[in-house]
């Protein structure tokens, strides 16, 4: 020990050297072995600051979920420090992005009975929301009739621009903001003309997600008359702690997100909701992904972490937030829509959607034009300064979706003199429609309808059109449908772990909004609205966060893995027409790569019968199984670990509520794989479950034993699932996989289902 201290002191005695003064400095995150701190230093901060000429270069110091710091240095300086014997990992700070009513009823939540009643609406569970902050004055954040703040709470309400501790109450019990990473990365720092250097929300996204997860009942809620009714979150009595890590027009930096994880765990949250991902970190391994690292630190302390699956669907392998200790949520529609039809001069009425609330067209027909007819893609996309006013003035303009915000295209049309817009999906979005609060009369139509409108505009000598805005309609069928934008599997890092885990409402969701910007978020939008309607996996994630709060309140002893298992094994696989779930982008039946285990069903999740628990040691074994060594794993776990030396474990044996059998592409002929699962009985003490197998096409699946007997003395039973397939004959199809399931029945009300995925691919 003395010799290692001497080595460290010798290393520290050298001044920090800049190898290239001309290099631009940037923020790097340094993962440090906290146990290596020499005893001469009173704190880790003092130790870290000895590495730099100026203490001001340190951005954050991390203590709770992560030992280390972030600092502004040159790449060569970062490489130099990488050789320090106490440095476990170094990674560059990266920018992430946000994954941007009626949904509680659609999830089966009802007053006076079921999970709301059993959990007392999530009373006293604390949800930490990592987002753009919060607008505390909204009715959704009233603390009327709430009890005192839970005594275990250790957080604070920070002061800043237009925010003070007085803005917190018994509902919003904590509010912090993390700006040091942004201030270091952005020239001139945060733009205070459009942002608040405080927890106050200048974007709206954080207010929306917070109220979706835990908003109070707000009567007579609507967005300019759309979706009128009672707005409420999934867990109306849960407490909210806002952690502002994302900044308007600047995104979210890893260094700030990691600092928020550190604070949230220290503060005492029970659930973390993080509708953030993608950006530069979309394919990073777990040990270089601060969201994965921070969420492991949280999960290891018993905190449930819910994250969004990303909005890059419907492309395969587009799902983000892949770590197995995170619950990854895709997006689906609900049974409410806002129809706005495009009416053509030839009499055809084509289905569309819109949230336009201005002066309607009242059936008046206008000339219609498609700028893309000339072959200029930028004009077809209605990009800034691409439309010829002579061509579009006084006309309805057909714009292709993509490359710029949907509502911004309408503003371009308006500036060029157009009177309206029809926004047409491309093939990638298919028939997936999202309502927007347009500034001009406008509607969105699917790919097929868009092609019809373009064909009409190009073939008719005097094409004309109008838009009919039809308000709000509920009871839409089919619903739910997997949103075309929702991130899809397979899991690009660990294909043995099916992602997303499940889907939840994420299309046209009504929730609270900021006063700082209008409903479009555009600087030119002067409108104010208490509520807004948004779509994205960002909106789906807080539904599961709120659901976790309800389950945690009803079952305080459940671990994060048990809560996720309860949700995953009790999902719905059919829509409200009693048909298989549909993929919005294709109109065809969806697969587990689209929806994971299925659609969240809170009525059944409260009493799942059997659950699959996962311990910290199980996660460590999983990390060993994918080839990580002890030092690499320590980057994630904080503490030293050991991997098995006799036999390498299989990643498929992680006790996950889904099963994926991955065979290498060079394995030809008859192959098989066996995985082990251990079920824990949380239902009646005396129970017998029997297995029912739905084998994937061309695959044989066996379960041993086929019968699980539980008693008051025996609450856990293990079973083996063996998958056998002839890779020469099996047809994997467009997805590259075939799908089945294993379901356990007790003869009563419990149906415990796990999807089975069989695929061939070579893991990284």
Curated annotation (Swiss-Prot):
Active site residues per record: 131 (charge relay system), 205 (charge relay system), 538 (charge relay system)
Induction summary: By methyl jasmonate.
BP GO annotations: plant-type cell wall modification; proteolysis
Domain PA: 377-457
Protein keywords: Glycoprotein, Hydrolase, Protease, Serine protease, Signal
GO cellular component, one term: plasma membrane
Chain ranges of the Peptidase S8 domain: 103-606
Keyword Protease in annotation: yes
Domain Inhibitor I9, first and last residues per copy: 46-99
Entry-listed glycosylation sites: 191, 578
EC number: 3.4.21.-
Gene Ontology MF terms: serine-type endopeptidase activity; serine-type peptidase activity
Pfam families: fn3_6, Inhibitor_I9, PA, Peptidase_S8
Domain of life: Eukaryota
Enzyme class: hydrolase
Signal peptide: 1-20
Tissue: Expressed in roots, leaves and flowers of mature plants.
Entry similarity comment: Belongs to the peptidase S8 family.
Protein name (Swiss-Prot/TrEMBL): Subtilisin-like protease SBT1.6
Gene that this polypeptide is encoded by: SBT1.6
């Amino acid at each position: 020990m003395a010799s290692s201290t001497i080595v460290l002191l010798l290393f520290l005695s050298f001044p920090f050297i800049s190898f290239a003064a001309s290099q631009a400095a940037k923020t790097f995150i340094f993962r440090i072995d906290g146990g290596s701190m020499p005893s001469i230093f009173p704190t880790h901060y003092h130790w870290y600051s000895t590495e730099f000429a100026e203490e001001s270069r340190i951005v954050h110091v991390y203590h709770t979920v992560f030992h280390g710091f972030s600092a502004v240095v040159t790449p060569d300086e970062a490489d130099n420090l990488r050789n320090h014997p106490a440095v476990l990992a170094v990674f560059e700070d990266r920018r992430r992005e946000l994954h941007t009513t009626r949904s509680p009823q659609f999830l089966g939540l009802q007053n006076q009975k079921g999970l709301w009643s059993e959990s007392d609406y999530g009373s006293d569970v604390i949800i930490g929301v990592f987002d753009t902050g919060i607008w505390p004055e909204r009715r959704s954040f009233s603390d009327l009739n709430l009890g005192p703040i839970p005594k275990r709470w250790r957080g604070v309400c920070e002061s800043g621009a237009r925010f003070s501790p007085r803005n917190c109450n018994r509902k919003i019990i904590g509010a912090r903001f993390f700006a040091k990473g942004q201030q270091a990365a952005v020239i001139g720092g945060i733009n205070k003309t459009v942002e608040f250097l405080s927890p106050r929300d200048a974007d709206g996204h954080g207010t929306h997600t917070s109220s979706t997860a835990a908003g109070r009942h707000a009567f007579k809620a609507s967005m300019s008359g759309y979706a009128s009714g009672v707005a409420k979150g999934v867990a109306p009595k849960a407490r909210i702690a806002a952690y502002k890590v994302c900044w308007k027009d600047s995104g979210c930096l890893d260094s700030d997100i990691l600092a928020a994880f550190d604070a949230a765990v220290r503060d005492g949250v029970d659930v973390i909701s993080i509708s953030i991902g993608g950006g530069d970190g979309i394919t990073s391994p777990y040990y270089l992904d601060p969201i994965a690292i921070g969420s492991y630190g949280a999960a290891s302390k018993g905190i449930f972490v819910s994250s969004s699956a990303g909005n890059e669907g419907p492309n395969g392998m587009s799902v983000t937030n892949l770590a197995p200790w995170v619950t990854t949520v895709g997006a689906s529609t609900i049974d409410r829509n806002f129809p706005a039809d495009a009416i053509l001069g030839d009499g055809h009425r084509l289905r569309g959607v819109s949230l336009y609330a201005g002066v309607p067209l009242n059936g008046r027909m206008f000339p219609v034009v498609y700028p893309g007819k000339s072959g200029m893609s930028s004009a077809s996309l209605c990009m800034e300064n691409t439309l010829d006013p002579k061509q579009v003035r006084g006309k309805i303009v057909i714009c292709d979706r993509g490359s710029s915000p949907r509502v911004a295209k309408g503003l371009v049309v308006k500036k060029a003199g157009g009177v309206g817009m029809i926004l047409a999906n491309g093939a990638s979005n298919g028939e997936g429609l999202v309502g927007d609060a347009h500034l001009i009369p406008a509607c969105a139509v699917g790919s097929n309808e868009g092609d019809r409108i373009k064909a009409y505009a190009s073939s008719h000598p005097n094409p004309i059109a109008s838009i009919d805005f039809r308000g709000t309609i509920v009871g839409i069928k089919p619903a739910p449908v997997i949103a075309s934008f929702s991130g899809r599997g397979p899991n690009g890092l660990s294909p043995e772990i099916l992602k997303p885990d499940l889907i939840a409402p994420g299309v046209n969701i009504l929730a609270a909004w900021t006063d700082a910007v209008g409903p479009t978020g555009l600087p030119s939008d002067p409108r104010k609205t208490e509520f807004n309607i948004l779509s994205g996996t960002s909106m789906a994630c807080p539904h599961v966060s709120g659901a976790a709060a309800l389950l945690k309140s009803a079952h305080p002893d459940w671990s994060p893995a048990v809560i996720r298992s309860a949700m995953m094994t009790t999902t719905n696989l059919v829509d409200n027409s009693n048909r298989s779930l549909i993929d919005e982008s294709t109109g065809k039946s969806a697969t587990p790569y689209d929806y994971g285990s299925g659609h969240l069903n809170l009525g059944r999740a409260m009493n799942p019968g059997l659950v699959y628990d996962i311990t910290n040691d199980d996660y460590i074994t999983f990390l060993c199984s994918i080839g990580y060594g002890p030092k690499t794993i320590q980057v994630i776990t904080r503490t030293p670990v050991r991997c098995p030396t006799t036999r390498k474990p299989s990643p498929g044996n992680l006790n996950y509520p889904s099963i994926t059998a991955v065979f290498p592409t060079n394995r030809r002929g008859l192959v098989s794989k066996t995985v082990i699962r251990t079920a824990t009985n949380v239902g009646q003490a005396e129970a017998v479950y029997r297995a029912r197998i739905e084998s994937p096409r061309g695959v044989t699946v066996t379960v041993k034993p086929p019968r699980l007997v539980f008693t008051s003395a025996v609450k856990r039973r293990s079973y083996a699932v063996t998958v056998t397939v002839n890779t020469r004959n099996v047809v994997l199809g467009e997805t590259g996989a075939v799908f089945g399931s294993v379901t356990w029945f007790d003869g009563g009300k419990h149906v415990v289902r796990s999807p089975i995925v069989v695929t061939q691919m070579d893991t990284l």
